């Protein structure tokens, strides 16, 4: 599926979005641009698992550039606030960590280097979804590293034992959910975590109605579009009919339910491969993976995560920073290193082939993990993240909290989130339009 970047948004428009962003955290100190050995010093802040291994490998492979890593708190746990603060204070490192949904927030500071000319040759080799993710406003602001398309993981042994077909549509998924509960009254087909705004966004992404897009010089906000409301209504009925659990993915309640065989599936991203292997290692060769069920059989899937890296506009060593980021995104060594501690799904397609070849596998029945993820990545529809996406994740999670108790519904939560998103952008002095236009 071809992806198209949003219409060009003026730099002024993005900068205006900075008003009202929270900024807190420690600032990095200035450092000499060279080391004692004469290598060009490049400073990077990141929370990416394994970044220390990547940095060590790069530094060992050459001696002209010396990368120095400062591990910071993960994005919404302080990383974005720390980086936003540093950019505003003109004291940022050379390289900053940004997931695709977080890049517009960093861009609103005016502190990122435009990498359009530096990286133009990378586009043909990148997954369209990853490339779109680093081009808010139609310019390239970061180097994509990985992508996290969503898929369906399921207990193939239990589905087969009870004769439950693998669902290909959401109607079939509901039928399968009813069959799971009929087979085991304590079991559910999956959980729908009401505490995770990024999960809900990924599920709505599949429906093909972007929550933001650029319309001339304005931001058009469409959180309550038809696709999102259809998604909300579907899952509201699944929750109301007690066909899914509502425990947060990854917490102790979820792990306990998985250990006891009370959850037969997981709607998750590429990184969920590692989550399953670590959480329920005893279930090796019981799980399988397939593409997400679809609406009306039309192939599409959402994305939940993916990392990219930007360069500070005030870096004294931009060429050296870009050199490292090119290596991080495209060098085969990175994919090989990644497979020693995770299941990487690179945004750069040649690196993805290297990761697949190095993948040790063995957990999933049939183990077509990369084949399924590749197919999912090709199904990702157009999407644009707005400058208030990170705050919106928290907002929608707050509204979803009342769904479990029955004090609100998913549909009502979506409509309230739309109102909040519009009010937030207008409070920053931005021109905001609503609906599909």
Describe each model-derived feature in a short phrase.
Residues 87-98, 186-187, 260-268:
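Alpha-to-beta junction loops
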Residues 2-105, 123, 166, 247, ...:
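Conserved N-terminal structural module of periplasmic/extracytoplasmic solute-binding proteins
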Residues 272-283, 295-395, 432-437:
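C-terminal lobe and pocket-closing loops
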Residues 139-145, 150, 174-221, 227, ...:
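Extracytoplasmic/periplasmic solute-binding protein
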Residues 93-94, 122-158, 188, 298-301, ...:
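A structural signal for short loop-to-beta-strand junctions that line the ligand-binding cleft
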Residues 177, 218-248, 292:
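Glycine-centered hinge/linker elements that transmit conformational signals in sensory
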Residues 100-150, 203, 288-290, 371:
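Hinge/lid segment of periplasmic solute-binding proteins
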Residues 160, 375-437:
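Conserved C-terminal helix/tail region of periplasmic/extracytoplasmic solute-binding proteins
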């Amino acid at each position: 599926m071809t992806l198209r970047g949003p219409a060009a948004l003026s730099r002024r428009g993005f900068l205006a979005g900075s008003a009202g962003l929270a900024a807190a955290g420690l600032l990095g100190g200035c450092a000499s641009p060279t080391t004692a050995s004469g290598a060009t010093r490049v400073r990077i802040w990141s929370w990416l698992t394994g970044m220390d291994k990547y940095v060590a490998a790069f530094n060992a492979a050459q001696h002209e550039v010396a990368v120095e890593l400062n591990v910071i708190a993960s994005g919404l746990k302080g990383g974005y606030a720390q980086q936003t603060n540093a950019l505003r204070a003109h004291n940022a490192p050379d390289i900053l960590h940004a997931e695709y949904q977080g890049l517009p927030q960093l861009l609103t500071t005016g502190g990122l280097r435009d990498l359009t000319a530096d990286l133009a040759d990378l586009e043909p080799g990148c997954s369209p979804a990853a490339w779109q993710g680093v081009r808010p406003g139609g310019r390239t602001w970061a180097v994509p590293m990985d992508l996290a398309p969503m898929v369906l993981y399921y207990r193939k042994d239990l589905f087969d034992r009870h004769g439950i077909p693998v669902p290909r549509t959401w109607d079939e998924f509901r039928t399968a959910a009813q069959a799971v509960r009929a087979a085991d009254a304590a079991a559910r087909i999956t959980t729908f975590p009401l505490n995770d705004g990024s999960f809900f966004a990924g599920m709505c992404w599949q429906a093909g109605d972007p929550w933001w897009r650029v319309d001339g010089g304005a931001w058009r906000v469409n959180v309550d579009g038809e696709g999102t409301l259809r998604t909300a209504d579907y899952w509201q009925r699944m929750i109301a009919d007690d066909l899914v659990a509502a425990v947060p993915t990854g917490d102790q309640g979820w792990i306990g339910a998985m250990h006891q065989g009370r959850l037969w599936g997981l709607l998750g991203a590429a990184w969920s491969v590692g989550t399953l292997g670590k959480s329920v290692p005893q279930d090796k060769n019981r799980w399988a993976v397939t593409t997400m069920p679809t609406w009306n059989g039309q192939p599409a899937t959402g994305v939940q995560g993916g990392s990219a890296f930007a360069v500070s506009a005030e870096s004294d060593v931009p060429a050296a920073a870009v050199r490292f980021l090119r290596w991080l995104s495209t060098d085969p060594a990175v994919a090989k290193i990644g497979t020693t501690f995770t299941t990487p799904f690179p945004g750069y397609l040649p690196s993805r082939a290297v990761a697949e070849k190095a993948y040790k596998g063995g957990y999933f029945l049939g183990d077509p993990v990369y084949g399924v993820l590749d197919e999912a990545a090709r199904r990702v529809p157009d999407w644009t993240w707005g400058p208030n996406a990170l705050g919106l994740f928290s907002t929608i999670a707050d509204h979803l909290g009342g769904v479990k108790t029955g004090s609100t519904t998913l549909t009502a939560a979506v409509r309230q989130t739309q109102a909040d998103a519009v009010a937030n952008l207008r409070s920053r002095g931005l021109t905001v339009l609503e609906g599909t236009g």
